[in-house]
Design a protein with these regions (language model features):
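Short, basic/aromatic recognition patches
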Residues: 1-20
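Short, structured beta-strand-loop surface elements
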Residues: 51-113
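Short beta-strand segments
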Residues: 16-50
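Polar/charged alpha-helical tracts
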Residues: 8-12, 42-43, 92
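Short, cationic low-complexity segments
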Residues: 111-125
Length: 125
């Protein structure tokens, strides 16, 4: 089940998370690359240090996603789509993520096992 999250309330949804998010990019072959990232808010952007692979992938394909795991079993994960820009200064790389869409998501209990629906997603507005 997914619940949309309004971008105007995203900072509150992020503040409720107890774990660091994973930043999801894709490499030249389309394979996913995931890495944990420490982020802070700067205006409307989420900003944090990133590695070489993330910088390379994000520069080539700036449409990325962030995934915050649920705080406890049965809770919602927070999934945020974002546009990534990488600032490079000396040997340091800084990811600047501008959120474009966000949802809370969790698997749903399937009331009828003969159906294909197996998720309980809700947009966060």
């Amino acid at each position: 089940m997914s619940i949309p999250v309004e971008l105007t309330t995203l900072a509150d949804a992020v503040a409720e998370r107890t774990m660091a998010p994973y930043l999801l990019t894709s490499d030249d072959d389309g394979r996913p690359h995931s890495t944990a990232i420490t982020l802070r808010w700067e205006g409307g952007e989420l900003v944090g240090p990133c590695g070489r692979s993330t910088a390379r992938n994000g520069t080539a394909r700036p449409a990325v996603s962030l995934l915050w795991p649920p705080n406890a079993p049965g809770d919602y994960s927070l999934i945020v789509d974002a546009d990534l820009v990488v600032d490079e200064v000396d040997d340091a790389r800084l990811a600047r993520l501008t959120p474009t869409h966000a949802i809370l998501h969790r698997p749903a209990e399937v009331p009828d096992p003969t159906t294909d629906c197996a998720h309980d997603c809700k947009p966060v507005l």
